Amino acid sequence: MENGDNIMDVKEFWIDVLKQNREKLISYFHKDAVIRWHCSNELFTVSEYIKANCEYPGEWEGKIERIEKTENMIITAVKVYPVNKSSSFHVVSFIKTENNLITEMDEYWADDTEVPEWRQNMKIGSKIWI
């Protein structure tokens, strides 16, 4: 679970999140960790988070788009989508660690959508990715 920076391996963590690997996910968390999904106003214990993640319908893939690290915080921006690519989401995660275990995780999930019509009518901006 550690890498050369002596901090949790967040890439492996995201692989296990996307694979819904219940057995491995628990190893990333301190037993008293708290997880917050701010967009839906939910607070989870570790077991509740793992249940919500691992019992979410479908098979999932994703791509880590950005990782930032400080002494005890990892920030990730990840694009998540079902294997059939019928939809996609972005999640920004603020992962607080202690002794290489997650003690707190604050996540902000958003649906990927088209530009709203009112902004299209303004004819401003351009696509980040196509």
Residue ranges, per PLM feature:
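C-terminal and inter-domain tail/linker signature
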Residues: 1-130
